[in-house]
Amino acid sequence: MIKHATIVFLSFIPIFAMAQNTDDYTSFAKAYGIMRYYSPNHHTENWNDVDWFKVGYYFADKIGDNQTEDVIKEMAAVLAPEAFISNKPKSKSAKNVQSETYQYRLHTGSGSISVSGYTPYYREIITCNGEHQEYSPETGRWYCYELGDRLYLNLQSSARRDCFSKEDTDNLLLEANRLWESLYDEEGDYMSEVISIFNDRTYRVTDLTIRWNIIQHFYPYKTEDGLDWESQLPVMIGKAMSDEFDKVERNTVFAYREMLQEMYSPIKDAHLDIDGSLSFPGLPARYLAQYYAPLALSCFEDCVIIEDSGLEIEKGSRLTKISGTDIEDVIKEKSQRISQTNKTAERWSAMYEAISTVERDSVMTITYITPAGEEKTAKTKCALNRPVTMKTPKAVFEKTDNILIVNLCEAEAFNEDFYESFMKRLEEENPKAIIFDVRGYPTYYFEKVLSHLTDKDMSNGFFRTPLTALPDQKNMGYEVNTGVRKPMEPHITVPCWFLADYRAMSWAETVLMYVKEYDLGTIVGTPSTGTTGDITQFTFPAFNLILTGLHAAWLDGSRHHGIGVEPDIRVEVSADDHLNGRDVVIEETIRRIQ
């Protein structure tokens, strides 16, 4: 009887251990993020993202063989020496505080952007001076953070400068580097090495720990997106612990990236991307390529239309199946791994994911219905380059009925002479109205043209850089862009019209926000995507994370994210209109001008 009972008990050990490990790693993940970003150890200021990854791996590797609380204490001994663990919430502050001996870490934005001479995101150690900003931590106070059941981390985000040890900090990174280097087999081939890293649960736990913390502490739209990110952490840790990534096969690498995309899909940020980079320290850098069927597509609510192809497929045919699976089912499945703020844009992104693969030399079977109603199939080998266009290229400048049409998103609009060419056309043709097409990504050279559309100063205050010095975005402040766009002569007085749809995002939306805010013209079409502001990047050994780094809103503070710029005149484009060669948006605009 006892033997039977013992057998039954042992049969539950793997499940219990799995749940216990998830809780342990969840507690570790929270502690790691708080110490990394909000304990002001100035000796770590020159550490880069990969250094921090190695340190995270070093401590995560200890969990399982050691009590989680002991691992967190060991981590705190270097990164936050005056922090302590308690089994219930504590309230504590230092006495007789001399402010000038304390410091805190201030994050102005997060991540990094690679633009010469432009550094909008940075972190710095601030020496306390007795003054208190809205975002700064209280000097000498231990803030209490719940890590798990009866497990609390008490940490000073404003701490004494001399409590941190350079020797201990340097030794920690040295030990972390040694452990990382031991992961590689000098005799192994590249792909085997990469697969073995993804097979390593400690690697996966470290990776998802950092990815969770980035959103938790820095994503500027966490509130607007309604993210219950706290509850996502155990889900992510559970995924990291799953044996689905323990397979010693090439597909494990691809499956892992897809899992990351799915984990981030609740985030509604059209800039968000899990790129294909593989840059493991100690291994050659590679990029996980994506291959596409040679189809240029247009996306509508009820169908996908083939605009052009590298195959003998009639233009205007409707795509119905990919390798035997209904296109709508494929789009639905792909949408689960896409971060978008606009449903139409989400469908468009999923449409191109539907005709892509990470497998070199893959062959897809395309099923389609011709304009005559005949169902046909074609087989095609996928190519490295994504199909470029949804539309036939147009001239940058067109004229009809004394209306100047400026196609801002055409490739030739990005030539350096765009501004001069526009001003020359304007003077020579003296149009009665101007139509600017921003259905896509417009040329940056349009920036100067904006200043000719107004006779008043225009504020750049749509954009705010988050300022954080405490975890969980507590007491977040903002650095508002105080720049001003000055009017330029000659002032353009003829009516201006702007065409928009879901393809207008980022810089295109900034243009439309100026138009709307300062009444520079009339917007026709459908709403823009709802994502603008400079991007930022976080570096990982594999699959860098890219997302929006700034917070954008209208000048009165009202929300833009996820809503976009609403047109003054709404005009929807149907598949039938498109197939008949009609641009009903521009047709309606011209009709109203006349």
Feature annotation, model-predicted:
Residues 1-20:
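Bacterial Sec-dependent N-terminal signal peptides
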Residues 24-28, 52, 67-75, 204-208, ...:
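Stable alpha-helical elements in mature extracytoplasmic
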Residues 27-28, 32-49, 60-63, 201, ...:
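Cleft-lining beta-strand/loop regions that shape enzyme active-site pockets
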Residues 29, 33, 102-152, 156-173, ...:
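PDZ/PDZ-like domain segments forming the peptide/carboxylate-binding groove
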Residues 31, 35-39, 61, 211, ...:
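Conserved PDZ fold ligand-binding element
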Residues 41-74, 220-271:
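Amphipathic alpha-helical substructures
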Residues 66, 71-74, 79-82, 86, ...:
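PDZ-domain C-terminal substructure recognizer with occasional recognition of PDZ-binding tails
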Residues 568-594:
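Low-complexity, Gly/Ser/Thr/Pro-rich intrinsically disordered linker/tail segments
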